[in-house]
Each structure stands twice: as structure tokens, then as C-alpha cells.
């Protein structure tokens, strides 16, 4: 019955998908929230069942901000939230350094796991995009929304010649502008006498929480860059306040696009 419902849903005029952190786990081996805690807090991460040993810096910060591991557990989102709240009422160079170091770790862990990754590990991503990006001409493009920072979907699309419209310009430097979501790609005949037909394999990608390759300048411009710094990377780091951060640009625009997509009939 579930399969029948899903198949009928795919026949609708508008198809919208929402991808969370689970799509980057499994075979591709992206970092989980626990992995981020392990690498931000412990001096001996990835040591299997051995007892974890927090770094001296982490122990000092946890003690200073009053974070209770027994109550809130080993939760990097809760820890960084407590750090942010603490810094709102008291200046602490030690806590600031820990937050900066943690952001650098998160940025690296969400980027590095794809370096040299075997193409077969993205097989599920490739199959998903291949099937949903090739739709009937009369149907709208598939819209994929994700809260992930990583580039799994970008890599999977690139490996099979799919085109993603992600709100960035098509020239260098690639800058973010929401109007690019309104663009489409068509195949024009060589004579130019006929109206073009929509190109197959095109979909929209909306990264609600930003991306590891988005860099925001002091003027507010957002560009695609290979290695942005933790301070300039345009993404919402794990924290309970991420919902409030979603109401600043460009995240507000992306959330608005998501809500608008949900209101479309036949979706």
C-alpha cells in the first residue's frame, strides 16, 4: 500500500523532497551528531569502544558554562547552544576559542568525507536524482530541499551529467541571487527557428542551512568557494538557536521557497 501511495505521488505535477542528515550517513559515512561531538570534545576520537577523554580545553569550557553531560548527554548541538547563551551574558576568551575550534571541526568533517570517495558510495543519491529529475515535460522540475551542509547531492548530480539550479549565478564568481531559481534550461534547435524543449535531468536544490562551500563576504554577498573559513562560511552551525538563524538571509529566502512549494496544489 505504501509503495502504491508513493508511486501515485510521483505522478503529481509538483514533486518536493526534503532530505535530512540520514541521507549522508550509511555507506557514504558522513558525520553524525555524535561524531561531531567526538571530534570537537574528545582528545581520542574514533577510538572504537575505548573510553573517550575530553581535551583540557573542552573540560574547562564545560565546567565554566555549567554544561551537565549527565543531563543533556554528549550532544554537540546542546553544548554549542550553551556556549552561545553563556557568551551573551559574559565575555570569555576560552569559550570563544572553543566555539571557533568546534566550528572549524564541523566544517572540515562535513567536507572531508567526500574527498576521494568511491562513486559507488553515492549510488543511492545518484539513483534518487536520476529517477526524479527526469520528469514529463508538462510537469515542474523536482525541488529538493535539504538541511545538510555537505555536497553529496552536488557530487551525485555531477557524476551523471544532471544540472542543478541552486540559486547561484552561472558565471564566475558564482553569486547567490534568488532570481536564479526562476531560470530554466531548454534545448534549442541549431536553426533557432523553433521554441526550445525543456532539458532532461534538471532539478532545483535548496540548502536550507547553508553549505560547506558557501562563503559570505563582509558586504553580505554569498559566493561559491572551495574552502571558506569557519568565520565566513555561510551555514547554520548546530545549535538550538538555528531556528532563529533561519530568519536571516539567505536562509529566510530558502525557507520561504520551501513554504511556497508546500502550498502549491497537486504537490
Q: Over which residues does each language-model region extend?
A:
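A Trp-anchored, charged/polar loop motif used as the substrate-binding/catalytic surface
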Residues: 1, 122-129, 181-192, 243-260
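Gly/serine-rich nucleotide phosphate-binding loop at the start of the catalytic core
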Residues: 1-155, 162-164
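Residue-level marker of regulatory loop/turn positions in helix-turn-helix DNA-binding domains and
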Residues: 7, 197, 247
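Glycine-rich anion-binding loop/nest that anchors nucleotide
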Residues: 16-22, 148, 207-209, 231-267
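A generic structural signal for short coil/turn motifs at secondary-structure boundaries
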Residues: 26-27, 217, 244
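Extended, H/D-rich, highly charged conserved domains that either
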Residues: 56-89, 135-240, 250
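Short, basic, glycine/proline-bearing loop/turn elements
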Residues: 111-116, 179-180, 241-244
Amino acid at each position: 500500500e505504501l509503495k502504491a501511495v508513493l508511486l501515485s505521488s510521483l505522478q503529481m505535477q509538483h514533486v518536493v523532497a526534503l532530505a535530512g542528515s540520514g541521507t549522508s550517513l550509511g555507506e557514504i559515512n558522513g558525520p553524525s551528531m555524535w561524531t561531531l561531538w567526538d571530534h570537537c570534545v574528545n582528545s581520542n576520537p574514533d577510538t572504537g569502544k575505548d573510553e573517550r577523554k575530553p581535551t583540557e580545553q573542552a573540560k574547562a569550557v564545560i565546567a565554566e558554562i555549567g554544561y551537565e553531560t549527565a543531563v543533556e548527554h554528549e550532544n554537540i548541538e546542546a553544548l554549542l547552544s550553551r556556549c552561545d547563551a553563556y557568551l551573551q551574558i559574559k565575555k570569555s576568551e576560552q569559550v570563544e576559542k572553543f566555539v571557533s575550534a568546534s566550528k572549524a571541526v564541523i566544517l572540515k568533517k562535513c567536507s572531508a568525507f567526500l574527498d576521494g570517495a568511491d562513486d559507488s558510495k553515492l549510488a543511492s543519491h545518484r539513483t534518487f536524482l536520476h529517477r526524479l529529475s527526469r520528469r514529463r515535460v508538462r510537469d515542474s522540475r523536482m525541488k529538493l530541499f535539504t538541511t545538510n551542509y555537505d555536497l553529496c547531492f552536488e557530487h551525485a548530480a555531477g557524476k551523471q551529467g544532471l544540472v542543478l539550479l541552486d540559486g547561484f549565478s552561472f558565471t564566475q564568481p558564482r553569486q547567490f541571487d534568488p532570481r536564479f531559481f526562476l531560470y530554466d534550461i531548454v534545448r534549442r534547435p541549431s536553426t533557432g527557428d523553433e521554441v526550445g524543449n525543456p532539458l532532461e535531468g534538471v532539478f532545483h536544490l535548496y540548502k536550507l542551512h547553508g553549505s560547506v562551500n558557501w562563503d559570505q563576504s563582509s558586504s553580505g554577498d554569498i559566493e561559491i568557494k572551495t574552502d571558506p573559513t569557519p568565520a565566513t562560511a555561510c551555514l547554520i552551525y548546530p545549535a538550538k538557536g538555528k531556528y532563529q538563524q533561519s530568519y536571516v538571509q539567505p536562509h529566510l529566502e530558502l525557507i520561504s521557497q520551501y513554504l511556497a512549494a508546500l502550498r502549491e496544489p497537486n504537490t
